[in-house]
């Protein structure tokens, strides 16, 4: 792995998009930093298994937008998470094995505590 991106690997999610209608989202990888910050590991699970319903709806809306646009979606959001005021910045990018259908998503999520 290139050392220039190694620092960010714990902040990445790799998500498979099923061919079902409607599509389902299965986390192939949920980055270790994200697991530590959320308290749950989505690796190997479908989005509908995410325990936090409000966050699940938020993520689903972003993933649906990526599918519809076939383009990256950038989000900057303020969140109160476990008593901390966080600024969350993410870029969610479509992946395609055939160049036509979005069958994967790469999600990079970074947080900073706001004081």
In which residue ranges do the predicted regions lie?
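Sensory/regulatory domains in signal-transduction proteins
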Residues: 1-115
């Amino acid at each position: 792995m290139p050392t220039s991106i190694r620092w960010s690997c714990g902040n990445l999610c790799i998500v498979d998009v099923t061919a079902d209608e409607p599509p389902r989202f299965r986390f192939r990888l949920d980055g270790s930093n994200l697991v530590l910050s959320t308290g749950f590991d989505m690796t190997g699970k479908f989005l509908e298994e995410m325990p936090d319903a409000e966050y699940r709806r938020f993520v689903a809306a972003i993933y649906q937008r990526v599918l519809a646009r076939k383009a990256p979606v950038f989000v900057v959001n303020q969140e109160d998470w476990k008593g901390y005021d966080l600024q969350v910045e993410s870029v969610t990018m479509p992946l395609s094995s055939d160049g036509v259908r979005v069958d994967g998503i790469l999600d990079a999520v970074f947080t900073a505590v706001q004081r």
